[in-house]
Structures are given as structure tokens and as C-alpha cells.
């Protein structure tokens, strides 16, 4: 029977102890415990040893659990805060009212009558209170409550033991010779023939090595970098700017009326302070009120400069595009921006209050709507979406407008962003006379499709296993 040097050494030591742990044997053999487990596994395959794996689960108090162990659970603190009875309104001022009241009632410590909370007696410590002192000794149902309330974390520890078998003892008794083995050969050993006198270590090429997890860029960041590289390769220049913008650039410069619902507090994050209006703001005012020097009639009414001075977290990256165009009104311009934007969205599987958006613009003398479709098809194609089609759309600051759709196997046609040519009301105040092609898309939506996710929140969770297992290459082409 062929044994490696380390298998032989382990087997001889097992004769002395019969049963051992990888940690103990690692000290004797001067090898890491993981290596000893590997040697034991090889002996086990040959019937010379047995490797047992025992998993132990332990509960550890969280920071919140430690605090409640010292100060008492919310229900105990709330119970101790009043005498015989108290109104629900009074108890609601207590910092633990929301959690504590429900648990007091569930444990039978109180009853509720006519809007008052009445104690039913002096309660003994609850099972959860007792379990905080020694979580591991608690019954299974109480452990579940501790975990559900976030008072403990569950940790698994694995312990291995290695035991010599009767076959192992027989082989050791028959005599084992320890011979130094060579696992690698030098060029000199091969050319001189010295390798013939060496004891070469045998390798089983059918065995899979243990996985190695090197550093890896987050899949979402990697896709953002891929988008950036594609646009740079297509000749675009990247724009950068602050997430804090004046309402003028975020709304007014894009010909969004000042009474538009998107500007309300429930849709936009407003910040304290005012922003100065830029040089040339009067032409934007005239455009809103009467259409300025164009054929447009504007929105009518009086444009309020104070509303335009409001400070907001940008709701889109188009605010950077129009600022860049205002500073560079002469063609050609070919630029893009990938950045985070903020909206007051209710959190659900497809909406978050902050997300990444990609914005692109092209301004030149002879560009037209067909050029826009060509740019979009080329970009999505390089992202790996080979089937692209376009549907008419509507967006406030582009005309004509279009919605690109890509075909996803199993989902059908999926809309990915919006595009169009900037309206005259957007470009004229800055002296721009050439067509401006513009498009934008939600980066996270593309990521969900590329990675097969159903919940947007998965992109931002600290799930190391998911990061490890997501393929590095996911179908894009350059």
C-alpha cells in the first residue's frame, strides 16, 4: 500500500495515541491542523484511520443582548416604569413601548382595558430573561426567540478527531519506513538524471484541491467598471460632479415645471441652505414663463428664483450633463456619467432610495435620431444583450423619445432606460444650436438581469458566499 511520508508519520503517531485531534497532532508533526485533517482523510480512504467531524452550535450575546442582560429586556424596563396601571398614551412615550408592550401582553404580565394597561401581578423572570444568562442552556423554542429578537448570534464550530483502525495498527506493526519524499523537481535534477535516485511523492490527479478565495472585486462594481470601459472605448469622456445640486440644475435647467410633483418633499431629498443661480439663469426663467426666443410657449405663470435656489440630493445624473453642455455649448461633445442618485422611494425588491444611474450625451452638427439608436444598440450589444428593439416613449426633456428593450430568455422583452433628443427648451438658453442625443438607464436594473437576481437589495448585502460564487465573466463583449 502506497503511503506518503506525512501519512506514515501520522499513522505511527496514531499507534501511540489511538485517537487524537488535528491540533494536537499538528504540534507533534509540525504541520498545520488543516494539513493533518488532509492526511487523516487520505488514511481514512485506505481504511487505516477514521476521521470524525462534530459540529457544535453556540449562542453568543449580541451587543443589544449584552445591554439587555445588564439593564433588563424592553418588556421588563417598561413594566418597571409604572405602578399598577397606566394609559397606553403615557406608555407610548417610553423608548421601549413598541417592543415592550407586545411582549408584556404575550407573557401575561398585563391586560389592556379601555385604553389602559393594567398589571396582573408580580411576574417571575421570563424564560427569555433567564436564557440571557446562559443562552446555550435554553430550550429550543427560547433559542428561536432569542435569535428572532436579535439578542444572540449563532456560531458553528467544527471539531475533528482522528482514530486509528485495526487495519492501521496491523500495517504499522508490520513495519513502516520513513523516507524523505520530493514533491518538486528542479531543472538540474531532471537534466542530470538525479531524479531517478529520489523518492517522488505520488499525486492523485483525480482529487480536487480545496478552494482558494483570493481577493475579488464586487460583481456590481465590476459591472459598473465594465460599462465605464465600454463607453470610454466608444470615445466618450467621463463626467464627475457633486451629489448635492441646486434645484436649478436638477429641475429648472431641464425644463421641468416648478409645480411638478417630482419636486415635492415626498419625492426628493431636500437639504438645508440655498444655491447661487449661475450666470445666464434669466434665459431659463424666460423659457419657463414664455418660451424665450423659441417657438415654445413655455409653462406660463411666474417662475420663482427662490425655488430654483433650493438644495437637493440629485435625483438623476442629467444635472451633470446639462451643466457640462452649458459650459461647452460648441460641438462636438461626447460624454457620460455613472453615479449614485437619490429619490424618496419606499424600499421593496425593485426600489431603493439610492441607486446608480448611467447618463450619456452626444452633441454634434449632423447627429440624428438614427445615430441615437445606433449608440444604444452598440452599447447594449457590448454589454451582452444581442437582441435590442426600440419603442416610442415620453420623457419630459427629450423629443422624440424612445425606450430601448432587450430580450432576456425566460423574461421576454425588458425595458432598460430611456433616451431621446434634448428639447429646444433645454438647450436654447445656453446657446446650443446642434442636436443633443441623450439617454439614461438604471445600472442596478441591468445588474439584476445580468446576475439573475430578483431582489435589488441583494446587490448591497454583505454576502461573502455570493461574491465568491458569482462568475467573473457574465456574457459581455468588448
UniProtKB/Swiss-Prot annotation:
Q: Which reaction does it catalyse?
A: tRNA(Phe) + L-phenylalanine + ATP = L-phenylalanyl-tRNA(Phe) + AMP + diphosphate + H(+)
Q: How is the cofactor bound?
A: Binds 2 magnesium ions per tetramer.
Required co-factor(s) are:
Mg(2+)
**In Gene Ontology terms, what is one molecular function of this protein?**
phenylalanine-tRNA ligase activity
Q: Which InterPro entries match?
A: aa-tRNA-synth_II (IPR006195), aa-tRNA-synth_II/BPL/LPL (IPR045864), Phe-tRNA-synth_IIc_asu (IPR004529), Phe_tRNA_ligase_alpha_bac/arc (IPR022917), Phenylalanyl-tRNA_Synthase (IPR002319)
HAMAP family (UniProt xref): Phe_tRNA_synth_alpha2
Name by which UniProt lists this protein = Phenylalanine--tRNA ligase alpha subunit
Instruction: Give me the gene this protein comes from.
Output: pheS
Amino acid at each position: 500500500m502506497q503511503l506518503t511520508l506525512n501519512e506514515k508519520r501520522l499513522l505511527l503517531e496514531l499507534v501511540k495515541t489511538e485517537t487524537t485531534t488535528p491540533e494536537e497532532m499538528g504540534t507533534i508533526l509540525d504541520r498545520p491542523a488543516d494539513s493533518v485533517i488532509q492526511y487523516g482523510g487520505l488514511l481514512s480512504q485506505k481504511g487505516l484511520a477514521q476521521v470524525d467531524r462534530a459540529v457544535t452550535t453556540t449562542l453568543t450575546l449580541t451587543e443589544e443582548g449584552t445591554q439587555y442582560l445588564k439593564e433588563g429586556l424592553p418588556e421588563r424596563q417598561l413594566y418597571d416604569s409604572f405602578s399598577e396601571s397606566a394609559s397606553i398614551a403615557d406608555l407610548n412615550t417610553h423608548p421601549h413601548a413598541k417592543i415592550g408592550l407586545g411582549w408584556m401582553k404575550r407573557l401575561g404580565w398585563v391586560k389592556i382595558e379601555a385604553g389602559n394597561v393594567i398589571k396582573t401581578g408580580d411576574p417571575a423572570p421570563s424564560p427569555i430573561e433567564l436564557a440571557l444568562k446562559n443562552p446555550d442552556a435554553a430550550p429550543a423554542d427560547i433559542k428561536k426567540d432569542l435569535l428572532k429578537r436579535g439578542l444572540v448570534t449563532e456560531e458553528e464550530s467544527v471539531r475533528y478527531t482522528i482514530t486509528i483502525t485495526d487495519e492501521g495498527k496491523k500495517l504499522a506493526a508490520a513495519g513502516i519506513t520513513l523516507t524523505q519524499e520530493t514533491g518538486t523537481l528542479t531543472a538540474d535534477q531532471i537534466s542530470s538524471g538525479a531524479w531517478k535516485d529520489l523518492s517522488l511523492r505520488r499525486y492523485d490527479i483525480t482529487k480536487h484541491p480545496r478552494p482558494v478565495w483570493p481577493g475579488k472585486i464586487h460583481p456590481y462594481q465590476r459591472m459598473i467598471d465594465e460599462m465605464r470601459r465600454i463607453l470610454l472605448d466608444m470615445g466618450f469622456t467621463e463626467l464627475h460632479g457633486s451629489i448635492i445640486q441646486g434645484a436649478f440644475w436638477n429641475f429648472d435647467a431641464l425644463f421641468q415645471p416648478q409645480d411638478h410633483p417630482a419636486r415635492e418633499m415626498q419625492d426628493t431629498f431636500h437639504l438645508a441652505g440655498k444655491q447661487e443661480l449661475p450666470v445666464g439663469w434669466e434665459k431659463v426663467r424666460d423659457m419657463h414663463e414664455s418660451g424665450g426666443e423659441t417657438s415654445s410657449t413655455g409653462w406660463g405663470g411666474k417662475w420663482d428664483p427662490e425655488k430654483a435656489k433650493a438644495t437637493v440630493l440629485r435625483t438623476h445624473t442629467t444635472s451633470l450633463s446639462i451643466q457640462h453642455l452649458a459650459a461647452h455649448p460648441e460641438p462636438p461633445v461626447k460624454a457620460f456619467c455613472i453615479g449614485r442618485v437619490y429619490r424618496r422611494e419606499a424600499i421593496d425588491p425593485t426600489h431603493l432610495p439610492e441607486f446608480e444611474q448611467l447618463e450619456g450625451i452626444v452633441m454634434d452638427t449632423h447627429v440624428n435620431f438614427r445615430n441615437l439608436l445606433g449608440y444604444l444598440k452598440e452599447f447594449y450589444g457590448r454589454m451582452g444583450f444581442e437582441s435590442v428593439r426600440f419603442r416610442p416613449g415620453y420623457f419630459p426633456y427629450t423629443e422624440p423619445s424612445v425606450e430601448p428593450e432587450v430580450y432576456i430568455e425566460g423574461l421576454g422583452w425588458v425595458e432598460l432606460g430611456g433616451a431621446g433628443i434634448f428639447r429646444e427648451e433645454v438647450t436654447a438658453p445656453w446657446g446650443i444650436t446642434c442636436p443633443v442625443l441623450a439617454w439614461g438607464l438604471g445600472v442596478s436594473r441591468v445588474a439584476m438581469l445580468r446576475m439573475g437576481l430578483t431582489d435589488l437589495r441583494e446587490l448591497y448585502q454583505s454576502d461573502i458566499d455570493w461574491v465568491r460564487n458569482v462568475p467573473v465573466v457574465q456574457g459581455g463583449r468588448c
